[in-house]
Every structure is written in structure tokens, then in C-alpha cells.
A protein has these predicted regions:
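Extended catalytic cores of very large enzyme megasubunits
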Residues: 1-800
């Protein structure tokens, strides 16, 4: 082979040293089986990518990409790639090292320097280095060995999305620096900030829980906008509309996700008395929000985004449903803002009875937005009588079932608008003493009141369930309890520390101290336990886990209230009356006049907790289950409560394109001695194992993918969790059918089972692209292309 020189970071050249590379690969294989064969495999394939003048950065990337090409054959290569990427991060930020002990010492030595330098450059808050923290003690706690818990996608996601960078874009944080920076940034107000930061760090660095994206990006930073979710309701006047655009821009800039309610805006054609003209209606103003989202720079890490909400009695609701359609007037379409419909029980009952549904101009029916449950139904019927008697300027009516099908047809085509239920949200709310909840947030899991003086905010952490399941398939309940309580305290601290340039958001945050503790990794733990997602065992486990976490989250908030005081609007809340989330199920049944079909069995001492919460609660809300798409990558687990989308698929993210192979499936098939013989067949079937002979039925049941499960399983899982969750749940739906009548049944069942919200609808594609693999004749490639500067796949043969 022609001599190859490597250009080092200082510009000097040195001959390519295969032994040096092989040693690095071997070290990355530590603890894995067949280490030598893995090194040989990677080293052989690496030869094809080398060229004279390759830089050390290019060489590092070439090694990693070569390793990743083999993930399809053995997921162990993902671990190797993660370790190699981590080594490049360490070298770039800390310098060279040889042993794990040296790496730990480098972390301890460099962390205080990093904090002080970042504060000096204005990247970190001055409080990080003002003496309240013992930086040496914190640095001594850093444990880079915990980075080995991460998969490759987790490492690259943290590096590209969450790690602190200089203004020139160069990263200055290792993963453990990131964890500690976040822990410190959420401990300023503790009596012993160092001890608190160490506790938070230990939970986060062990991936027991992960804060929401905005917190990960901004904690400890010079402008700590840490809240994840913002909910604002637009009033029917120009000042409110203009302010909503401004507020949207500020929130998006700070990486927050936004829910925006537009139901109050008068309909198109409605008189505008001040100018003696007619209103253009809410749709053009929604377009303004959409444009603002596109225009704002969002730190280049975590994109800000919004969901626009409207109740379906609005006269312009038909145009609202079309907002996400690809065709039509572009000025009446939103390309960046999502849409969601806020649905009343009255509408769902009319769908069931096949009755008419009336649409009104909010200018003539302004109180409907503030009413819910029985009060809404009574007032709505009064407006119907007024309309039919000619006492309203304008109205429209359609069969309720027809409108429902219209919504669901759009949902099938565009995955919008998402379906959320106003009355279920408000009747079951424990914090509705401060007003009506008019909408949810970007991801449909936050349910907080908002008005002109309050832009509701919520702060998120998600518990990684898989971190508490032992190898022997037992649960570490004590550690889960500790993590839940620590997460609540961490989130409560966040309420005092977070900043935003919007006074109404700061006011709401201080008045409610709302937090949302969620879960992720459900599908991951079900697979490890051998439970099918649609089994009774799975449903009971979801029930048990969410009850346990809810109980200890509520208990911790009550303890914090005793220590620090209740949130300011506690008096008059459901909590102050000793009402808990599980108690509101009967309240909802009474309001509907029909029993909500939710299993209400309990396992813990809820009577004792009822007495305790009457005395005080630190937070208006405690739980909300977010989708966790990105922080799930960081934790190396499955998102939220979703099933596996597929066992093998290509994932495209802002961080690149990655091949995802279900490690649990590979592990189980390896135990049965089936993986090596069947992996090609599994790839040919695009990861679908249901029709592959030789795989036991129990394995097939456990590894059903989202489109192979009954949609009623998604509803059952969410219903079991929702009874314990005081806010809501991001419930993605996956349907194989395109029958709209079946959609009506499914979403009606979701309402009957007490779900507060749903999120995206994913419909199984009609066609799947043909898969190919690339087989390379390595010997021919090396012999013939020896004079080529860049080697690649010139002699590749396509296998179909």
C-alpha cells in the first residue's frame, strides 16, 4: 500500500500507524465478545477510506463511520462507536490521556478552569464561580466512566445539541461537564449548593432522569431560560395579537416550546367597530405566528416551535383544519406551526348521537371559551336557541359526525390537527381555581390555566425507567423513589432560577411553580421483561409505575411546602381540599353523566397523602408525560410511553442519519442462538420478525412494532397512566387502517377512557422502499485503486 501520511492538529505530518489505530479500536472493544475479530473487521474496512494527507479529525471520523457500518451485523459496534467518539471529545477538550484514571484526573483538574473561563467569557452565569460552589469538590465527583452508559446517538446528540460551545462553535464540555453544569445551574438557591449539585449530578449522570431540552441547553448559562413549555391565549384585540407575536419570538429564541390559543379571535367578516370594517378572522394572524417561528434564530441547538389551538365551535374552524394542507393559498397555510383542536364533551356526545354541531362567531359568544363541562353544554344550547331564533348575526351548523370525520381525515393526511379534550382537562384539573385551561402546549402534555396576566409555563424532567430495572428483572423501588423526589426538588429549584423577558410568564411561573415529571423507556423495559405492549402484564406495570412515581412526587411536593411554603395560589385548589389526581376520575364521570372507563384500583396509602396535601403543596402540578424524542436519545432508551416504531430503521435527526437496531431483540435472539442465522432475513423484512420461521411466538409477541399493535393498546396504556398524572400525556397514535369510520371509533374510545390529549397520528405507509445492502470486494478495491487518493466503493456490488 502506498505510504499514507496523517496531518496532525498542529499541521505536522506523521506516517499512518495502523497499530495505533488497532489499539484504539481494541480498547473500545473492552468487555465485548469477539474483540479481535471486531478489530480485524474494522481495520480491514478502514483501509478503503484512507488517503495521503488525511487529517487526524478525518481519520477519527473515518474510524467511527467504519464501525457504524457494522452495527447492522452486531449492535455491539454501536458501543464501540460511542467510545471512539467520546475519546475524540476528550482529546479535543481535555488533551491526550492513556488510562481511565488519567481521564478522571483530567476531568477533576480541568473542570474548575472550564467554569471560571466560561464565566469570564460570559457563557456561564456569574453564580457558577462566585464562591457558593466548592469547584474542587464538584470536580472530584466527576465520573467519566458513566459516559459508557450512553449509546452512540446519545453521545452525538449531547455533543451537537446540548454541550456548551464558544461563540466560534467549538465545544468546551465533555458529557460529564454538561451534567455537572446543569446540576450547578439548578442549585443556586439551596442552603448547601455543592451538596445539592452533587445529588442532582449523580442522578443525571447515571441517566436516571434527564431534564427537558431547554434546561439542558441553558442551565448554568448567562441567560437561564430553563422552562420548557409556554402556553399563551390570544385575546380579540390588536394589542394582544401583536404581543403574542412578540412573545412567541422571545420564547422561540430561548428554545421554549409554545402553545397558542386563537379561539377568542372574532370570525372573518365580523364587524370591527373602531374602523368600521370587517375582520379578516384568525387565520392570517396564525400565519404571522408561523412566519415569526421561521424568522427567529433559536441558538442553533434546539429549535423553538409552536402549536396553535382552536375550539371546534369557532365559525372559521373549517379553515383552521386546512392550515397544514400542502395545497391551497400559502397565506392560509402554516408550515412551521402545528395545529390542535380543543374538543368539548358536548361535541363528543353529539357525534355519538349523530346530532348537528353549531359554529359561532366568538364576538357573539365570548363566554364559551371560559366555560367547560356541564356549564359549557348548558350555555352552548342557549346559543343554539338564540341562533335558530335569529338573535345571532351569523352561525353555521354541520352534522357533528361529519365535522369529526373532517378532522380525522385531515389528521390522516397531515397528522394535524391533534385531538385534545377541553372538558376532560378542566374537570380533572387540580389547579383550575385560577381560571380556565384554554389549550395545551406544543407536545400536548401540559395543561395549565392562562389569561392576559399569565402565560403559563412548565418545567420538565423525565425519569428513565430502564435505569431502575436490574439484570435479574427486578425493580429497584428505593432508588426510583429517591430519583423521583430528587427530580421534584430539582424542578422546584428551577422555578426560582429560570428567567424570561416576558413578565406574564415569570408571574405565572412564580404563582403556580408548575412542574411536569414524566417517564420514558416504557417499551424498553417491557422488552427486557418479556411483556408484549398490548398484554395485561404491560398494562398493570404501567399502572404500578405511574402510581408509584405520582405518589412520591406528590409527597415530596408536600414536604417541600412544609419546608419552603406552598405555591401562592394553593388556597382553593383541589390539593387544598385533599383531592388527588385519582379522585378526579369520579368527578369527570359525574360531569359527563357517564362513567369513565378507567380502572381505579390503588396500591399505596393515598388516604394518608390526602390528609398531607391539604396542609400545603409546593407545586400546582407534578406530572406530565412528554414525548422525550431527543432526551430519550441521551438516555439511550425508547421515547415516552411509545412502542417501538420498528426493530431496524434509519433515523434522520438534526445530528445526522443513524441506523437503529433494537439491542433488546438482538440480545434475545442471540440467547436463542438465532441472530447470526436470521439477521439477513430480518433485515430483508425491514426488521419485521412476525413472518420469519424459527422465531418463537413469545418473542414475536414482545417485538410487535407500533403498526402491528392494536390501537386500543395505546389507549389502554395511556388511560392507566392518565389516572395518576395530574397534567396530560403525549400519546402518539399508530394506525394501519385508513378507514375513517374506524378512526371515529378509536378516538371516541380515547375520549371515553379519559385521555386528555393525543399527539401525532402515524399512518402506516402504503408502500415501503426496496432495501439494498452494499457488498464490497475489498481485495480488488485495494489492488486496483492503490494510486487513488481517496478510496471508496468503486467496486461495490449492489445486492437486492
Amino acid at each position: 500500500m502506498k505510504e499514507i501520511n496523517v496531518v496532525k492538529r498542529d499541521g505536522t505530518k506523521e506516517p499512518f500507524d495502523a497499530n495505533k489505530i488497532n489499539t484504539a479500536i481494541l480498547k473500545a472493544c473492552e468487555g465485548l465478545p469477539d474483540q479481535i475479530s471486531k478489530v480485524v473487521q474494522v481495520a480491514t474496512e478502514l483501509q478503503l477510506t484512507l488517503f495521503d494527507g488525511i487529517t487526524t479529525e478525518q481519520l477519527d471520523e473515518a474510524v467511527i463511520q467504519t464501525v457504524l457500518q457494522n452495527v447492522k451485523d452486531d449492535p455491539d459496534y454501536d458501543k464501540i462507536a460511542a467510545r471512539l467518539l467520546l475519546k475524540t471529545v476528550y482529546k479535543q477538550i481535555l488533551g491526550d490521556y492513556e488510562t481511565a484514571e488519567e481521564l478522571k484526573k483530567l476531568h477533576a483538574r480541568e473542570f474548575p478552569k472550564f467554569v471560571k473561563a466560561a464565566v469570564k467569557e460570559g457563557l456561564l452565569d456569574k453564580r457558577m464561580a462566585d464562591g457558593r460552589f466548592d469547584l474542587k469538590k464538584l470536580a472530584a465527583e466527576l465520573d467519566p466512566a458513566r459516559d459508557d452508559l450512553s449509546k452512540y446517538l446519545g453521545v452525538v446528540t449531547n455533543k451537537n445539541r446540548y454541550a456548551l460551545r464558544k461563540q466560534n462553535g467549538s465545544p468546551i464540555e465533555t458529557p460529564q461537564f454538561t451534567h455537572m453544569r446543569i446540576a450547578m445551574g439548578l442549585s443556586y438557591n439551596e442552603s448547601d449548593p455543592t451538596t445539592a449539585a452533587i445529588e442532582f449530578y449523580n442522578h443525571m449522570s447515571n441517566l436516571e432522569y434527564v431534564p427537558g431540552g431547554s434546561t439542558r441547553v441553558n442551565a448554568g448559562g448567562s441567560f437561564p431560560q430553563l422552562s420548557n413549555c409556554f402556553l399563551l391565549n390570544v385575546d380579540d384585540d390588536m394589542e394582544s395579537i401583536a404581543k403574542a407575536v412578540r412573545d412567541t419570538m422571545w420564547i422561540a429564541k430561548g428554545t421554549g416550546g409554545i402553545g397558542i390559543g386563537f379561539t377568542k379571535l372574532r370570525a372573518a367578516g365580523s364587524p370591527v367597530k373602531t374602523t368600521n370594517t370587517e375582520s379578516t378572522g384568525p387565520i392570517p394572524f396564525m400565519k404571522m405566528i408561523d412566519t415569526a417561528l421561521f424568522a427567529v434564530s433559536r441558538k442553533g441547538k434546539k429549535a423553538g416551535a409552536a402549536a396553535i389551538y382552536m375550539e371546534n365551535w369557532h365559525l372559521n374552524f373549517d379553515q383552521f383544519v386546512d392550515l397544514r394542507q400542502n395545497s391551497g393559498d400559502p397565506y392560509l397555510r402554516t408550515r412551521f406551526a402545528n395545529t390542535a383542536v380543543f374538543i368539548s364533551d358536548e361535541f363528543m356526545k353529539r357525534v355519538e348521537k349523530d346530532q348537528d354541531w353549531y359554529l359561532f362567531d366568538p364576538a357573539e359568544t365570548p363566554d364559551l371559551t371560559e366555560l367547560y363541562g356541564e356549564e359549557f353544554s348548558a350555555r352552548y344550547k342557549e346559543y343554539i336557541k338564540m341562533a335558530e331564533a335569529g338573535k345571532l348575526r351569523t352561525f353555521d351548523k354541520v352534522p357533528a359526525r361529519q365535522q369529526f370525520k373532517r378532522i380525522l381525515t385531515s389528521l390522516q393526511a397531515t397528522s394535524h390537527p391533534w385531538l385534545t379534550w377541553k372538558d376532560t382537562i378542566n374537570v380533572r384539573a387540580l389547579n383550575n381555581n385560577t381560571g380556565t385551561i384554554h389549550l395545551s402546549n406544543l407536545c400536548t402534555e401540559i395543561t395549565l390555566p392562562q389569561d392576559k396576566n399569565n402565560i403559563a409555563t412548565c418545567n420538565l424532567v423525565s425519569i428513565n425507567l430502564s435505569a431502575f430495572l436490574s439484570e435479574d428483572k427486578t425493580w429497584d423501588w428505593d432508588r426510583l423513589k429517591e430519583a423521583a423526589r430528587a427530580a421534584v426538588r430539582q424542578l422546584d429549584n428551577l422555578c426560582d432560577i429560570t428567567q424570561t423577558p416576558i413578565p406574564e410568564a415569570m408571574h405565572s411561573n412564580q404563582q403556580t411553580r408548575a412542574i411536569g415529571l414524566g417517564i420514558m423507556g416504557l417499551s424498553d423495559v417491557l422488552e427486557k421483561l418479556g411483556y408484549c405492549y398490548e398484554s395485561k402484564e404491560a398494562y398493570d406495570l404501567v399502572d404500578q409505575l405511574t402510581e408509584f412515581i405520582s405518589y412520591h412526587a406528590i409527597d415530596q411536593s408536600a414536604d417541600l411546602a412544609k419546608e419552603l411554603g406552598s405555591y401562592p395560589t394553593f388556597a382553593g385548589s383541589g390539593w387544598s381540599k385533599g383531592i388527588l389526581p385519582i379522585d378526579t376520575v369520579d368527578k369527570l364521570s359525574k360531569d359527563r353523566g357517564v362513567k369513565v372507563k378507567i380502572d381505579q384500583k390503588t396500591r399505596l396509602d393515598w388516604d394518608g397523602l390526602r390528609k398531607k396535601v391539604k396542609k400545603g403543596m409546593r407545586n400546582a402540578t407534578l406530572m406530565a408525560i412528554a414525548p422525550t424524542a431527543n432526551i430519550g436519545h441521551v438516555a439511550g432508551t425508547t421515547p415516552g410511553i411509545d412502542p417501538q416504531f420498528a426493530q431496524i430503521f434509519s433515523r434522520s435527526t438534526l445530528n445526522g442519519k443513524f441506523l437503529e437496531v433494537n439491542h433488546n431483540l438482538v440480545r434475545d435472539l442471540k440467547k436463542l442462538g438465532l441472530w447470526d442465522n436470521l439477521k439477513d432475513e430480518i433485515f430483508a423484512a425491514q426488521g419485521d420478525i412476525q413472518d420469519i420461521d424459527g422465531i418463537p411466538q413469545n418473542i414475536k409477541d414482545v417485538y410487535k412494532t407500533s403498526f402491528q399493535l392494536s390501537p386500543y393498546a395505546f389507549i389502554e396504556v395511556a388511560a392507566r397512566a392518565q389516572k395518576w398524572v395530574d397534567q396530560a400525556i403525549s400519546r402518539n397514535m399508530y394506525l394501519e387502517t385508513r378507514d375513517i369510520d374506524e378512526y371515529v371509533k378509536i378516538y371516541s374510545e380515547a375520549w371515553k377512557r379519559g385521555l386528555k390529549t393525543t399527539y401525532y397520528l402515524h399512518v402506516k405507509p402504503r408502500h415501503q422502499s426496496e432495501q439494498t445492502t452494499v457488498s464490497v470486494d475489498k481485495i480488488a478495491e485495494q489492488k486496483v485503486r492503490t494510486n487513488s487518493k481517496v478510496r471508496g466503493f468503486g467496486f461495490a456490488k449492489i445486492n437486492k
